[in-house]
């Protein structure tokens, strides 16, 4: 997806300048009341719905993405409402989102730099609930970075970092999605640089230069589209 094709007209007022293309950041995408409602629904989910990973735990809604295709599952009404709200922004080639990954991060937890991969339409949208976080972007590793004959290289530094406040919507498209890695450092406090602010600082009331932001428990709703969908019978070879 080229940068020009990745633009979303309805979101252009929220485009993050001075950042890799194409990133949109929408503050207060949902209300405080909606945030509280969604958090109640997430934490009221049955225990078997949770999967514990190293550094976070998650819920998977809509089906399990698979290279052969995803057998779709109906989204619960409390999620479908917000999937529709995001889909109405025309992020997924005119088609609706059909998958939601719910992540819970406790203070001090994060996720290693990664790419979302080819199972998804090349756009990711994330609603943040409960607490802020800082999302870091990295250039992909080069083959020579893994050369055992070379001296060990220091950990990569982010090319840019965004502050994500509660109730915000983040959308990644184009090179920001297809080329760069993104991750969240395992930290309890985010110390903002006193000399430079995140590129989306103008939309973040808490982004004061030199501020130390203490993380709380954060829940993210990652809303995407899985293009390849199968009926159960096809997956079973029937």
From Swiss-Prot:
Cofactor mode of binding and number, as noted: Binds 1 Fe(2+) ion per subunit.
Localization of this protein: Cytoplasm; Nucleus
Region (Disordered): 138-161
GO molecular function, one term: dioxygenase activity
Gene3D superfamilies: Alpha-ketoglutarate-dependent dioxygenase AlkB-like
Required co-factors: Fe(2+)
UniProt binding sites for Fe cation: 114, 116, 182
GO CC annotation terms, alphabetical: cytoplasm; focal adhesion; nucleoplasm; nucleus
Effect of residue 68 to A: Almost completely abolished the ssDNA binding activity
Keywords: Cytoplasm, Dioxygenase, Iron, Metal-binding, Nucleus, Oxidoreductase
Pfam families for the chain: 2OG-FeII_Oxy_2 (PF13532)
EC number assigned by the record: 1.14.11.-
PROSITE patterns: FE2OG_OXY
Tissue spec: Widely expressed, with highest expression in testis and pancreas.
Residues covered by the Fe2OG dioxygenase domain: 96-227
Binding site for 2-oxoglutarate: 103, 105, 218, 220
Function: Probable Fe(2+)/2-oxoglutarate-dependent dioxygenase involved in oxidative demethylation of nucleic acids. Binds nucleic acids with a preference for ssDNA or ssRNA to other types of DNAs. May play a role in nucleic acid damage repair.
PANTHER family hit by this protein: ALPHA-KETOGLUTARATE-DEPENDENT DIOXYGENASE ALKB HOMOLOG 6
Record note on quaternary structure: Interacts with VCPKMT.
Family assignment from sequence similarity: Belongs to the alkB family.
Protein name, as recorded: Probable RNA/DNA demethylase ALKBH6
Organism: Homo sapiens
This protein's encoding gene: ALKBH6
């Amino acid at each position: 997806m080229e940068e020009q094709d990745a633009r979303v007209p309805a979101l252009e007022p929220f485009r993050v300048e001075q950042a890799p293309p194409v990133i949109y950041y929408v503050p207060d995408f949902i209300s405080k009341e909606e945030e509280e409602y969604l958090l109640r629904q997430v934490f009221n989910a049955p225990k078997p719905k949770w999967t514990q990973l190293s550094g976070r735990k998650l819920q998977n809604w809509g089906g399990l993405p698979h290279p052969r295709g995803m057998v779709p599952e109906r989204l619960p009404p409390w999620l479908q409402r917000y999937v529709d709200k995001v889909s109405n922004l025309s992020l997924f080639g005119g088609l609706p989102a059909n998958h939601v990954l719910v992540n819970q991060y406790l203070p001090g937890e994060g996720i290693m730099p990664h790419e979302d991969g080819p199972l998804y339409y090349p756009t990711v949208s994330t609603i943040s609930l409960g607490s802020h976080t800082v999302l870091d972007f990295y250039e992909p590793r080069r083959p020579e970075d893994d050369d055992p004959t070379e001296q060990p290289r220091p950990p990569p530094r982010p090319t840019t970092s965004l502050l994500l406040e509660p109730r915000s919507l983040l959308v990644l498209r184009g090179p920001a999605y297809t080329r760069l890695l993104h991750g969240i450092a395992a930290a309890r406090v985010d110390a903002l640089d006193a000399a430079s602010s995140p590129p989306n600082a103008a939309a973040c009331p808490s982004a004061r230069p030199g501020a130390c932001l203490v993380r709380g428990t954060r829940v993210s709703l990652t809303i995407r589209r899985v293009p390849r969908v199968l009926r159960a019978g096809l997956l079973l070879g029937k």
